[in-house]
Regions:
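Short cysteine-rich loop/turn motifs with clustered Cys
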Residues: 537-568, 590-592
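A conserved non-catalytic segment of reverse transcriptases
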Residues: 220, 229, 333-398, 404, ...
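Extended C-terminal regions of large enzymes
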Residues: 433-436, 443-534, 613-618
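Histidine-centered nuclease catalytic patch
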Residues: 184, 558-591, 599-608
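Conserved polymerase palm-domain catalytic core
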Residues: 106, 150-151, 156, 163-339, ...
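Conserved pre-catalytic core of RNA-dependent polymerases
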Residues: 5-9, 18-242, 246
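Polybasic, low-complexity binding patches
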Residues: 576-584, 596-637
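Right-hand nucleic-acid polymerase module
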Residues: 2, 372, 376-455
Length: 657
C-alpha cells in the first residue's frame, strides 16, 4: 500500500464515541429542544435504546474506574464477554423488568484519605448499576447543559480548572473586584436533599416520571460500609457514582442563576444593546455603568463543583453577600456552610485559596496584578509525596522494579507541573520543592562513594526533548538509564478562558474542537448494527474502533471497503489458541484476504493470490498475520508455496462480521 499521509484531525473522545453509535444527532436534538424550553416526558425510550446502552458500555470501558469492582465483584470485562443483545436485554430488565421497579444493588463504601487527616467517603456502585447510570447521564447531560450557567466549570464537557482560574484572574485583575467571599459547604455530597433535587430536575423540564423514579432509587441505594453493616441514606448522593457530578451541578445551578440575577444577568441589562467579544461573551459595559448608580450589589460567581467563590467590588457588598448566600443556601437548598472556612478576603492584603491555588493582587505601578502560588497544603503534600517516591526508587516495591518506580516518579512530576503551572509563581514553588527533592535524590541514590545519578542515559523521546531537553538539571539512573524529570524545570502558563462558542451539542460549537469522521459513515453504521450472533460486546465494540482507525480500509491491501459483506474481523492470535477479543488482537481485512490468512491448501492459496495480486509490502503484512495464526508464510519463489501437510481452512474464516 503506498504511503499515504493521513490528515490530522481534531478529536474529542466522547464525541467520537457518539458518532460511532449514531447518537450525536439525538443528543443535538435534546440540547436544542431544552434551549427552546420544551418539556421532556418520555426519555426512557432513548435511555434504553440499543445504541445508547452500547455507547454507555464503550464510555465506561474507556474509563480507568471500570476495573474497580462493586459489591458484586464484577468488572466491565465481565459485561464485555456477553453479546450485545444480552447486554441490552439485561439493562432493560434491570430498569423495567424487576417486580418492584428498578432496585440498585448496595454501593461499596471506601474511605479515601484527605490531606487534613480526614477521609472522603467514596461510593462504588456495582458495574451493572454504573452502566444504567451512564445510560441516564448521556441523555440527561445535553438537556441540562442547555440550562446550566456559564459560570460553573466542574464536571462539564469542554470546561476545566484552567477556565475557572482564568475567570478568577480576570475578575480580580481586569474587573477590579478585590473582595473574595470564600464559601465551604459542609459535606455537600452527603447532604443533598433528595426531594429538592427531584424538584430541580422537574424545573429543568425533565418530567419523565419513570426516569425520576429511577433517579430517586439511585439516590437511595443502600451503602455497604467497610465494617460490613448496611446503611439506607435519606439524603446525599454518593461520590463515585457516574451520575453524581451531573446531579451536583443540577443542585447548585439554582445558586448560579440566583447570583447572576443580582447583577450579571439582572433584567436591567435587557434595556441595553450589547455586542460580543472575540470569545463570544456579551459586552455589557453600558448596562453595568447604569446599574452602578442603583442599589444593586455587584457580584460574580466562579464555581467548580461544590467549591465556589463570589467576587465583589466593596467590603460592604462582600459582607452582605456572605450573609445573604449563607441564608439562601440554608433556606432554598437546605445546605449549611462551615463558619470557620467561610470568610471575606481582601486579595490586596492576603491570599484567597481556590482549587489548590492561593491567589492575591500585588501593586505594580498604579495597578494591581495577580500573584498566585500553590496553596500551602498542596505544597507540603507535593514535597512529601515526591520525597517518599524517591525512597521507592532506592527500594523498589514488589513487582515494579527500579525503572517502574522512576516512571511513576516522572508521571507524578508531570502531573504536578501540568496542574500548578497556572500559578504565576510556580517556578518559585517548584524551585523550592526541587532543592529538597534533589538533596534527597543525591543522598538516597548513592552506594558508598558511587553516585547512581548520571548526566547521560537512554535517548529521550520527542516529548521529553521538547519539555526537558534544555534542562541542565536532567539526570539519569545509572543502571536503568531512565531519566528523572526535574520538578523545578517549569514555567507559568497563562490560563485560557472558556470559549463560549464551543459546544458539544451544536454543529458550529463542535467544529471548534472536533472534526467529523472522514470515512464512510454509512458503512460504519451498518457495521455497528450488523448482527454479531454469539460474538462478545467487546468484539463488536472494538470492530467499530478498527474501522475508524483503519480509515475504512483493509489492513493488508489498503483498499476501501465497499459493502458490509467485504469486511471480515480477524483475530491475530486465534481464540482457539488463547486469543482474545481485545482491540490489539483484532484487525479488519477483506473477505478473500481473511480466507488467505487461514488457507493451507496450495490450490486455494494460488487462487486467492491470483485474484488479489498482492505486492511485496502487502505480502509481508499477510505473512505476518499468517505467522501469528500459526500458518506457514507464503513464499512465491518456491514451487510449494507452504510446507503444510494438511488441507482445508479453519472455522475462523467462516465467521465474518
Amino acid at each position: 500500500m503506498p504511503n499515504e499521509k493521513k490528515p490530522k484531525t481534531k478529536c474529542v473522545e466522547y464525541l467520537r464515541h457518539a458518532e460511532y453509535y449514531d447518537m450525536r444527532s439525538i443528543f443535538d436534538e435534546l440540547y436544542a429542544r431544552s434551549q427552546a424550553g420544551e418539556i421532556f416526558e418520555n426519555l426512557m425510550d432513548v435511555i434504553l435504546s440499543r445504541e445508547n446502552i452500547l455507547l454507555a458500555y464503550r464510555n465506561i470501558k474507556s474509563n480507568t474506574g471500570s476495573i474497580t469492582p462493586g459489591t458484586d465483584k464484577l468488572k466491565i470485562s465481565d459485561i464485555g464477554k456477553l453479546t450485545a443483545d444480552e447486554v441490552t436485554a439485561r439493562v432493560r430488565k434491570i430498569v423495567k423488568g424487576a417486580k418492584n421497579g428498578y432496585t440498585p444493588r448496595s454501593v461499596r463504601r471506601k474511605d479515601i484519605p484527605k490531606p487534613n487527616g480526614n477521609t472522603r467517603p467514596l461510593g462504588i456502585p456495582c458495574i451493572w448499576d454504573r452502566l444504567v447510570q451512564q445510560c441516564i447521564k448521556q441523555v440527561m447531560e445535553p438537556i441540562c447543559e442547555a440550562r446550566f450557567s456559564n459560570n460553573s466549570y466542574g464536571f462539564r464537557p469542554n470546561r476545566s480548572v484552567e477556565n475557572a482560574i482564568a475567570a478568577t484572574y480576570r475578575l480580580m485583575q481586569k474587573s477590579g473586584l478585590h473582595y473574595v467571599v470564600e464559601f465551604d459547604i459542609k459535606g455537600f455530597f452527603d447532604n443533598v436533599d433528595h426531594s429538592k433535587l427531584i424538584k430541580q430536575l422537574w424545573s429543568l423540564n425533565i418530567r419523565d416520571k419513570e426516569l425520576l423514579y429511577v433517579i430517586r432509587r439511585i439516590l437511595k441505594a443502600p451503602i455497604l460500609m467497610p465494617d460490613g453493616h448496611t446503611e439506607h441514606p435519606t439524603k446525599g448522593t454518593p461520590q463515585g457514582g457516574i451520575i453524581s457530578p451531573l446531579l451536583a451541578n443540577v443542585v447548585l445551578n439554582e445558586l448560579d442563576h440566583w447570583i447572576e440575577s443580582q447583577w450579571q444577568c439582572n433584567p436591567v441589562t435587557e434595556n441595553y444593546a450589547y455586542r460580543e467579544n472575540a470569545a463570544g461573551c456579551p459586552i455589557q459595559s453600558h448596562a453595568y455603568r447604569a446599574m452602578r448608580n442603583t442599589r444593586l450589589k455587584e457580584m460574580y460567581i466562579v464555581r467548580y463543583a461544590d467549591d465556589f467563590r463570589i467576587l465583589c467590588r466593596t467590603r460592604e457588598q462582600a459582607d452582605r453577600t456572605l450573609i445573604a448566600v449563607t441564608q439562601w443556601l440554608k433556606e432554598r437548598l437546605r445546605l449549611d456552610v462551615s463558619p470557620e472556612k467561610t470568610r471575606v478576603v481582601d486579595v490586596r492584603r492576603s491570599y484567597s485559596e481556590f482549587l489548590g491555588f492561593k491567589i492575591r493582587l500585588r501593586k505594580k505601578g498604579k495597578k494591581y496584578v495577580v500573584q498566585s502560588h500553590m496553596c500551602d497544603k498542596a505544597y507540603k503534600k507535593v514535597k512529601a509525596s515526591l520525597t517518599k517516591q524517591v525512597g521507592n526508587i532506592k527500594f523498589p516495591r514488589k513487582g515494579r522494579g527500579e525503572a517502574g518506580e522512576v516512571r511513576l516518579f516522572n508521571s507524578m512530576v508531570m502531573g504536578i507541573q501540568n496542574y500548578y503551572q497556572l500559578a504565576t509563581d510556580i517556578s518559585i514553588d517548584c524551585g523550592d520543592i526541587g532543592r529538597t527533592v534533589n538533596t534527597v535524590l543525591k543522598n538516597r541514590l548513592k552506594s558508598g562513594k558511587t553516585h547512581r545519578l548520571k548526566k547521560e542515559g537512554r535517548d529521550l523521546t520527542k516529548m521529553e526533548i521538547q519539555r526537558y531537553g534544555k534542562s541542565e538539571q536532567l539526570r539519569y539512573i545509572a543502571q536503568s538509564k531512565e531519566p528523572i524529570y526535574p520538578i523545578s524545570y517549569v514555567q507559568c502558563k497563562n490560563p485560557m478562558s472558556q470559549r463560549r462558542k464551543v459546544c458539544a451539542y451544536t454543529a458550529a460549537g463542535r467544529s471548534e474542537i472536533h472534526d467529523d469522521l472522514r470515512i464512510n459513515t454509512f458503512l460504519l453504521l451498518q457495521l455497528m448494527r450488523a448482527p454479531t450472533y454469539s460474538r462478545s460486546t467487546e468484539y463488536a465494540d472494538n470492530r467499530i474502533s478498527l474501522f475508524s482507525a483503519q480509515w475504512g480500509k483493509c489492513a493488508v491491501t489498503g483498499k476501501k471497503f465497499q459493502c458490509i459483506s467485504e469486511i471480515h474481523c480477524h483475530h491475530k492470535k486465534p481464540k482457539g489458541i488463547g486469543g482474545s477479543d481485545k482491540y490489539e488482537n483484532l484487525v479488519l481485512v477483506l473477505a478473500p484476504v481473511h480466507e488467505l490468512i487461514h488457507a493451507v491448501d496450495e490450490d486455494t492459496i494460488r487462487s486467492y493470490l491470483t485474484a488479489l495480486k498482492l505486492d511485496t509490502s502487502q505480502l509481508t503484512k499477510l505473512n505476518k498475520l499468517r505467522t501469528l495464526a500459526k500458518r506457514k508464510p507464503i513464499d512465491l519463489e518456491k514451487p510449494n508455496l507452504t510446507n503444510n501437510s494438511h488441507n482445508g481452512m479453519t472455522k475462523e474464516t467462516k465467521k465474518s462480521v
